[in-house]
A protein has these predicted regions:
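Secretory pathway targeting signatures of secreted, lumenal, and periplasmic proteins
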Residues: 1-59
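Surface-exposed amphipathic alpha-helical segments
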Residues: 7, 13-15, 127-157
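Short loop/edge segments at beta-strand edges and connector loops
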Residues: 19, 79, 157
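Residue-level recognition of well-ordered beta-strand positions that form the cores
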Residues: 45-47, 96, 131-133
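Beta-strand elements of well-folded, non-transmembrane domains
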Residues: 50, 99, 114-115, 134-136
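Loop/helix-junction capping segments adjacent to catalytic residues or to phosphate/diphosphate-binding pockets
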Residues: 54, 102, 139-140
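Signature of long, low-cysteine stretches enriched in small and polar/charged residues
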Residues: 59-121, 147
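Short hydrophobic/glycine-rich mini-motifs in sensory/regulatory modules
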Residues: 120-128
Length: 157
C-alpha cells in the first residue's frame, strides 16, 4: 500500500498501545495521519482473515456491518453500497458514532477474495476491510486520502 502525504505506518513499539488489537492476527496494517493533536488521530486499519462460514457473500457483508454496530455502541450507518471500482464486488460503508464526547466518522471498504482450489484443498474465502476513522470535523480533509490509499492496497491471505 502506498500512503498519502501526511500519513505514516505505526512502528512496532506503538502496536503495544493498541491493547487487545496488538495481538490480533487479523490486523494486517495500521497507519495514522501525522498530526500535532493527540487523542483521536485519523487511522487507517487493514484487517483480513479466512471465512469459516458457508454464508453467501451478501450475508457475510451484512454480518460484518452488524459486527461494527456491536463493537461501536451508538454507531449509525449512513451509507452501504456496492463499490464501483476495484476490488470487484466490494462494499463501501460510512457511519458515525460518539466516543468520549467526540463525533467520529468511519469509512470502510470491505471485500472478499478467494483462493484457487488445489488437489488438496477446496477454494477458500477471505474477508478484508480497510477502515478509516477520524474526528468527523476532519472527515472532509481525510476522505480523499483514504480513497487514494485504499486503491493501492494489495492483499494476500
Amino acid at each position: 500500500m502506498t500512503l498519502s502525504s501526511g500519513w505514516r505506518f505505526l512502528i512496532p513499539e506503538e502496536y503495544a498501545q493498541l491493547g487487545p488489537l496488538a495481538d490480533d492476527p487479523s490486523v494486517r496494517l495500521v497507519a495514522v495521519a501525522k498530526t500535532k493533536d493527540e487523542g483521536n488521530v485519523p487511522t487507517f486499519v487493514v484487517t483480513g482473515g479466512a471465512l469459516s462460514t458457508d454464508a453467501s457473500d451478501d450475508e457475510v457483508y451484512a454480518d460484518s456491518v452488524r459486527q461494527v454496530e456491536e463493537a461501536l455502541p451508538g454507531f449509525h450507518l449512513i451509507d452501504d453500497f456496492a463499490w464501483p471500482m476495484l476490488p470487484e464486488g466490494a462494499r463501501w460503508r460510512t457511519g458515525v458514532y460518539i466516543l468520549d464526547d467526540v463525533s467520529l466518522t468511519l469509512s470502510q471498504l470491505t471485500w472478499i477474495t478467494r483462493t484457487a482450489p488445489t488437489t488438496q484443498q477446496p477454494p477458500q474465502r477471505f474477508l478484508w476491510t480497510a477502515t478509516c476513522t477520524c474526528p468527523s470535523v476532519l472527515f472532509p480533509t481525510i476522505i480523499d486520502d483514504f480513497i487514494t490509499m485504499a486503491q493501492t492496497l494489495e492483499v494476500t491471505p
